Swiss-Prot record:
InterPro entries: MRS2-like. This is Putative magnesium transporter MRS2-H. The chain crosses the membrane at residues 369-389, 408-428. Its main location: membrane. Putative magnesium transporter. Belongs to the CorA metal ion transporter (MIT) (TC 1.A.35.5) family. It comes from Oryza sativa subsp. indica (Rice). Pfam families: MRS2-like. GO terms for cellular component: membrane. It comes from the Eukaryota. It is found in: Membrane. One of its GO terms (molecular function) is magnesium ion transmembrane transporter activity.
Length: 435
């Protein structure tokens, strides 16, 4: 079978050209024609993990991003079973990241992993890697970029320092101790899972701050328009703004309550230190297999605030996590207070507008009362004049001054005017009329 032209060498191509010039070769070429190969399909953007090719399983696959502590990153299309096997989590914990329960923020601490579900940040963190759900979403991209920019630099620093640790000199043991401090200093006192949790809380807080700033600017503009003109359109804009603030407040309150719950639960805080447990298991295994090796330890009394930690993780990790969560708890509390301030500003403006509307309504009621009193006086005068006018003598259509008709009309008008004045005086003294 003849090969395609793309795989022929230069000499073979020349021979093929000379062979094709003869009539016999033309007949052979018509017999041995090779059909053109179709173009290969484009490579998929992500690897597909998980067993089964059914439509149901294909529908359950979701996009994940895997990032390890050395900066290795890849996109994976997989189902829950693959994620459960890789992270060591039971299936019930993965339901927290599902579409039904994703609206309830939670931070779950398990034996081998930590599940983070904070608004748009949904991730599974182990001691060595992090799995981020839906990394291409618009609101998740800042968090993903933060991770990708941070951990490659950290891995380079750790690699350089660990290379320095393996160099031998006259003071070998002292050099190992100093390098151990440098490794921990390169990590900024935070284990891998603490750094991911730090970035997740930071991304959520930045999103909240951005949202409340936008709502604050919108509130100022909307309320200014409302004070100028109380219309249906402006009232609808205020109602929509209050609904957005209510949803944001509920979201911030849920995240704040979750952080507060972890701060109050020391056992849950200890379970979050997955790196400490993994490192302790590795150190125990190394001690059993190689008892002659010495662990890099330090007995310095310098506090944690100096930025130096021991190589073997200790209970100070829980203290570091406590300070980290407490800082974000205060930040979330500040965001909640900002929401309360904006809501109070809206409520105060609504109260001011309500006072103005009440004042206008009182003015209208005063005007209505004035018109009613005046109409009452005119109606009485008209009724009396109409009832008794036929019994008053007159000389045709020419009325003469001094006849009973003029006296009667004057007396009736004076009486009605007196009644109107009395009614106005009563309304004025009882503050039924506006000033």
């Amino acid at each position: 079978m003849a090969l395609p032209c793309a795989f022929l060498s230069a000499a073979a191509a020349a021979n093929a050209t000379s062979f094709s010039s003869s009539p016999e070769s033309r007949r052979c070429r018509s017999v041995h024609r090779v059909p053109s190969r179709p173009r290969p399909p484009l490579a998929p953007p992500a690897r597909v993990m998980g067993k089964g090719n059914s439509k149901r399983k294909a529908a359950n696959t979701r996009l994940w991003m895997r990032l390890d502590r050395r900066g290795g990153c890849e996109m994976i299309l997989c189902d829950k079973s693959f994620v459960a096997r890789r992270s060591g989590l039971p299936a019930r914990d993965l339901r927290v990241l599902g579409p039904l329960l994703s609206r309830s923020p939670s931070i779950l601490a398990r034996e081998k992993a930590m599940v983070i579900n904070l608004e748009f940040v949904r991730a599974i963190v182990t001691a060595d890697e992090v799995l981020v759900l839906e990394p291409l979403a618009q609101e998740v991209l800042p968090f993903v970029e933060k991770l990708r920019k941070h951990f490659p630099l950290k891995s380079l620093d750790v690699d350089d320092v660990s290379t320095h640790m393996h160099t031998e000199n006259q003071d070998g043991e002292l050099a190992q101790d100093v390098s151990c401090y440098e490794v921990e200093g390169a990590n900024h006192e935070l284990p891998f899972e603490f750094q991911v949790l730090d970035f997740a809380l930071e991304a959520v807080c930045l999103s909240y701050n951005s949202t409340i700033s936008d709502l604050n600017r919108s509130a100022i503009a909307v309320l200014d328009d409302l004070m100028k003109s109380v219309s249906t359109r402006n009232l609808e804009r205020v109602r929509s703004l209050k609904s957005s603030l209510t949803r944001l407040l509920a979201s911030v309150q849920k995240v704040r309550d979750e952080v507060e719950h972890i701060l109050d639960d020391n056992e849950a805080m200890a379970h979050l230190c997955t790196a400490r447990k993994t490192k302790g298991q590795k150190d125990l295994l190394n001690t059993i297999l190689f008892p002659e090796t010495r662990l890099c330890r330090t007995h310095s009394s310098i506090e944690n605030s100096t930025g130096i930690r021991t190589c073997v993780p200790s209970d100070s990790d829980a203290h570091i996590l406590d300070m980290l969560l407490e800082a974000y708890f205060k930040q979330l509390d500040g965001i909640r207070n900002r929401i309360f301030l904006v809501r109070q500003y809206i409520v105060d403006t609504e109260d001011y507008i309500s006072i103005q509307l009440d004042n206008k309504r009182n003015e209208l009621l005063g005007l209505q009362l004035t018109l009613i009193i005046a109409s009452f006086g005119i109606a009485i005068n008209t009724f009396i004049a109409a009832a008794f006018a036929m019994n008053i003598p007159h000389r045709g259509y020419h009325f003469v001054i001094g006849v009973p008709f003029g006296q009667f009309v004057g007396a009736t008008s004076f009486l009605c005017m007196s009644i109107v004045i009395l009614l106005f005086t009563y309304a004025w003294r009882n503050r039924l009329l506006c000033t």
